[in-house]
Amino acid sequence: MTPQQRAGHFALPSKPDRNPPPAEEARRIEDKQGPLRVLVVEDDFLIAMQTEVALTAAGFEVVGPAMTAEEAVALAGEAQPTLAVMDIRLASTRDGIDAARQLYQDFAIRCIFATAHDDAHTRGRAEPYAPLGWLPKPYTMASLVAVVAEAVAELRRRP
């Protein structure tokens, strides 16, 4: 199949590997700590839209998506998200780890890294910025929501 034949169709299958948290649970957490905002940083528009839909359906407020490190930092400064789902390879000169560094240092925002580049070197570069998790691509939307819910639970345990 040529790229032209594949154009126009995109799917991220989401098998029932984990159940997303109910919207009521997200609202309960939100009532205690303010709105649960998730900054989505992803330069693939279709993945960003799927991510937004899945997180919104699970009861999270989505900020973004940002497609570059610069957009991510600007949005974080404006919206003060609870956490970020960060792609590492972005459409800018700065990568997601550099954006995560700035989010962590300037705003104390921690990230879940969603990436196909999950090697020891990459993890080592990200470790100083206290990752909340790693989501290897390709991932299901159910896995995404579960990892975000786990990250929120971790943040609740350690503010």
Task: State the predicted function of each range.
Residues 1-37, 105, 142-159:
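Non-catalytic signal-transmission and effector/linker regions of two-component phosphorelay proteins
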Residues 42:
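Conserved acidic carboxylate
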Residues 49-57:
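Charged docking surfaces used in two-component/phosphorelay signaling
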Residues 52, 65-83, 91:
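Acidic, metal-coordinating helix/loop segments flanking the phosphotransfer/catalytic sites
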Residues 87-101:
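Conserved phosphotransfer microenvironments
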Residues 126-135:
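As written
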